[in-house]
């Protein structure tokens, strides 16, 4: 089974299958989503102290903050050639 992994910056990688949305962090509703995820313990900050440029929403209700532009993450997600891939060993 081939798993497509997406680099979201600074060596952080997310499974492409788990991504539901990639959005910009500027709007009030997205800021609320980030705060609610922080309160629930479902926020993953992958910015390494840099400015948040993309908010990735996953199917498990985790919210991931990335310092990479949303367009860049989307381009990596839609590219035919995965940046990183892993194959599950066959028993």
From Swiss-Prot:
Residue ranges of coiled coil: none
Protein name as catalogued: Putative regulatory protein Moth_0891
Disulfide feature: none
Domain of life per record: Bacteria
NCBIfam families for the chain: MtxBflmRegRemA, PRK04323.1
Protein species of origin: Moorella thermoacetica (strain ATCC 39073 / JCM 9320)
InterPro entries: RemA-like
Record family assignment: Belongs to the RemA family.
Transmembrane segments: none
């Amino acid at each position: 089974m081939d798993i497509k992994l997406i680099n979201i910056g600074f060596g952080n990688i997310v499974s492409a299958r788990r991504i539901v949305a990639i959005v910009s962090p500027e709007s009030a509703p997205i800021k609320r989503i980030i705060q609610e995820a922080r309160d629930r313990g479902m926020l993953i900050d992958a910015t390494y102290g840099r400015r948040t440029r993309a908010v990735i929403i996953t199917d498990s209700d985790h919210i991931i903050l990335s310092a990479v532009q949303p367009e860049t993450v989307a381009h990596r997600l839609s590219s035919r050639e995965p940046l990183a891939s892993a194959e599950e060993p066959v028993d």
